[in-house]
Amino acid sequence: LPVILFAPSWGDGNALALKGVDIIAALIEEYEIILRPHVMSLIEDSQTLDIIRQRFGSHPRFSLDLSADSAPSIRRADLLISDWSGIAFEYALSFLKPVVFIDGPMKVFNPNWNRYLQEPGIEKSRRKSVGVIVSELTNLRPVINELLSSADVWTTRIMDARHELLFYPSECAAVSHRTLTLLAEHQTGTEWVRV
């Protein structure tokens, strides 16, 4: 049975609050579902989470992951469903597995972002490099089935995206350590250079 991790973001218009119950209901009979809500959703979307617990809490193919450690759920998942959460790219680029993005309002914490950037960033511009955007929930299961059945194609596609988006993908920890060491050695004054 394929394992689907549903890890939405939080804030206005997030997929959990708007469509969470419907998403789980549409998938629970065909897949194992792990819901991993954002920690802020425990406060902001507590009513939705209560409804989900009541409706699906005892279902053998449903689990609610509230652990501080996301790694076990991420590793188990064959596919991730999210909205505008950064976990989507972390998952896809780390595990070379596809993401289904539930279409909804873009998460914007700085409404003046376009004053400083020419493009909205990878969370908007590169979504189709690592997955498929779903606007209508009636398309959700067919899209998931297509992504799972074409996993090899998506692995290659996401690998290409990873090479375009990440610097030193297999050596990033060592390179980051060297960079921070150089910054520390050349630090002047008492403030760190903000990068």
Go through each PLM region and give its residues.
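Hydrophobic/aromatic beta-strand patches that form the interior of the parallel beta-sheet core
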Residues: I34, S63, L79-I81, V100, ...
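Donor nucleotide-activated moiety binding/catalytic core segment of transferases
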Residues: Q47-F89
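A short acidic (Asp/Glu
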Residues: A15-L18, D45-T48, A77, F89-S94, ...
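Catalytic binding pocket for nucleotide-activated donors in carbohydrate/polymer assembly enzymes
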Residues: W84-L165
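Short, amphipathic alpha-helical "lid/cap" segments that border enzyme active or binding sites
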Residues: L137, R141, S170-T181
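Short, conserved catalytic or adaptor-binding loops enriched in Gly and charged residues
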Residues: A26, D50-S58, P120-K128
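Short, solvent-exposed loop/turn segments at secondary-structure junctions
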Residues: S9-G13, V39-L42, S70, G86-I87, ...
